A protein has these predicted regions:
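Local sequence-structure signature of Cys/Sec-based thiol-disulfide redox active-site neighborhoods
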Residues: 1-30
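Alpha-helical transmembrane segments of integral membrane proteins, especially early/N-terminal helices
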Residues: 9-10, 14, 74-84, 149
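Structural alpha/beta surface segment adjacent to cysteine/selenocysteine redox centers
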Residues: 24, 37-48, 52-62
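Thioredoxin-like thiol-disulfide oxidoreductase module
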Residues: 28-46, 70-75
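Membrane-interfacial helix-loop segments of redox and metal-homeostasis proteins
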Residues: 42, 84-243
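Non-catalytic, surface beta->alpha helical segment in thiol-disulfide oxidoreductase systems
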Residues: 53-79
């Protein structure tokens, strides 16, 4: 479909995939609503684009992906791809910060920056769609189920704790008392909620940790996020006491 003001992205992706697989493609553009309606009627389909290989009707972009053996996520399928992408990015971000600000690479310093930046990025993910996040969060968080506004406050609390920890790493400032308890509180409540939902009640849920309408399974990843928040708060308080 190539109409004024709209160029079909699925058509472009199908075309690119076919070319990458070595096919010579005869790309027939549908440029008017009349052409689109006539094509759908002639081939008894509801959507465009449609791909034909060797005279055989393969289907739309999703069917083309399946044809070439790519995984296509169904409505109820889960994946760890979003969380792997986030943690890989925040690990590299933390590494860049440590190499730039410190004379040597120390594991403790790296982990602090990694945990703090991960909290910030995960909070940003949630803030992209707060309503969607809350809908998923209410499925398992024990405090949010009793007091719904907590669900709306959670992403902001996580962002606050993450930014606060980033600002105070290595300072030994008493201001850590304004930040660490927030991380400890929401992390502890979250960890208990995940343990109950997944490991006690044996429920199969998706995790709201990367935002609304996530297809990341609830379990170890969400538990890790909450333990990191609580642990980071305790860690920074222990450093303050020792200083």
């Amino acid at each position: 479909m190539a109409m004024p003001g709209h160029l079909c992205p699925f058509g472009l992706k199908s075309l690119s995939m076919l070319k990458l697989k070595g096919y010579e493609v005869n790309d027939n553009l549908l440029e008017t609503r009349e052409e689109i309606d006539a094509f759908k009627k002639a081939h008894n389909v509801n959507t465009t684009p449609q791909t034909f290989i060797g005279g055989e009707h393969v289907g739309g972009y999703t069917e083309v992906k399946k044809h070439f053996g790519y995984r296509v996520l169904g409505k109820d399928d889960t994946t760890y791809t979003p969380i792997v992408a986030i943690f890989t990015s925040t690990a590299l971000m933390a590494l860049a910060i440590v190499l730039n600000l410190y004379d040597e690479l120390q594991l403790q310093t790296f982990l602090m920056w990694f945990f703090a930046t991960s909290m910030v990025v995960l909070a940003i993910q949630k803030l992209q769609n707060v309503e969607g996040f809350v809908n998923g969060f209410l499925g398992y968080d024990l405090l949010a189920q009793r007091y719904v506004p907590y669900g709306y406050a959670y992403p902001f609390a996580e962002l606050y704790a993450g930014f606060g920890m980033m600002a105070l790493i290595g300072t030994g400032s008493v201001l850590i008392w304004l930040v660490a308890p927030v991380g400890i509180f929401i992390g502890t409540v979250g960890a208990v909620s995940v343990i109950k939902a997944v490991y006690i009640d044996k429920r199969e849920l998706t995790c709201a940790c990367v935002g609304g309408e996530s297809n990341v399974p609830l379990g170890f990843i969400s538990l890790s996020e909450n333990l990191i928040m609580a642990g980071m708060g305790i860690w920074m308080l222990s450093i303050w006491f020792a200083s």
